[in-house]
């Protein structure tokens, strides 16, 4: 797989009849019940639904943090279910960026060092990773904040650092799990406008989980989950 794949008629991500069951027998819990989702390169898709509807399980499968019980998950044409645990970890590290509700930054580490972490894991030379991290922070509007620790940043700034960290490796897809969940309305809108800009101007593929219809409206389309199923098909986002 390539970080920037050549044009391909197949979707970037294809979920077909994906089922996820936890437990066995009478204790079995069906988190996903045969869902089908296609995600094209450059898409911006929001997943919505009540707690327990299956959207977080779907996100974990997309991020190679979990595997389907049945069905097919293809990433750039590769059947993820046939990969070993180590191969899935490599796919996750090299092709998928993550943004979380809780930011997940190292508290006593500078913004620059937080953004550099994925590049350190890749073995990138210090000078090159410093430059890449600075570019990523500049792209999220944090030039001049490189030396500040997480404790010195607002919630919105911390999420910007987290987005820079997720994008510094130039992933094929960005998975954002409730990226505005810990922010007030004004900061939430700023983060969504930032994600929208990356999607429209740079063509970054984004999949987002949110409980907030106002935030989902920034996506190109919205997929509604209910009781482990995709409810009523896939609708275009309002905005």
Model regions: which residues?
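ABC family nucleotide-binding domain
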Residues: 11-226
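ABC-family P-loop ATPase nucleotide-binding domain
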Residues: 1-21, 231-239
């Amino acid at each position: 797989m390539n970080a920037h794949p050549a044009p391909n008629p197949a979707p970037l991500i294809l979920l077909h009849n994906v089922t996820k069951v936890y437990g066995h027998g009478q204790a079995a819990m069906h988190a996903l019940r045969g869902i089908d989702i296609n995600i094209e390169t450059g898409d911006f898709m929001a997943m919505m639904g009540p707690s327990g509807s299956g959207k977080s399980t779907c996100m974990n499968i997309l991020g190679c943090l979990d595997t389907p019980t049945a069905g097919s998950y293809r990433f750039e044409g590769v059947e993820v279910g046939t990969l070993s645990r180590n191969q899935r970890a490599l796919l996750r590290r090299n092709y998928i960026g993550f943004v979380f509700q809780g930011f997940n930054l190292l508290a006593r580490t500078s913004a620059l060092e937080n953004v550099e972490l994925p590049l350190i894991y890749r073995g990138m030379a210090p000078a090159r990773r410093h430059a890449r991290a600075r570019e990523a922070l500049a792209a999220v509007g944090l030039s001049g904040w490189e030396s500040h620790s997480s404790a010195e940043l607002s919630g919105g700034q911390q999420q910007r650092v987290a987005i820079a960290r997720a994008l510094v490796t130039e992933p094929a897809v960005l998975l954002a799990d409730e990226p505005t969940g810990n922010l007030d309305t004004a900061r939430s809108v700023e983060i969504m406008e930032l994600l929208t800009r990356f999607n429209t101007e740079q063509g970054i593929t984004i999949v987002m989980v949110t409980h907030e219809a106002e935030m989902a409206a920034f996506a190109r389309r919205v997929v509604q989950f209910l009781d482990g199923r995709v409810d009523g098909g896939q609708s275009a986002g309002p905005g």
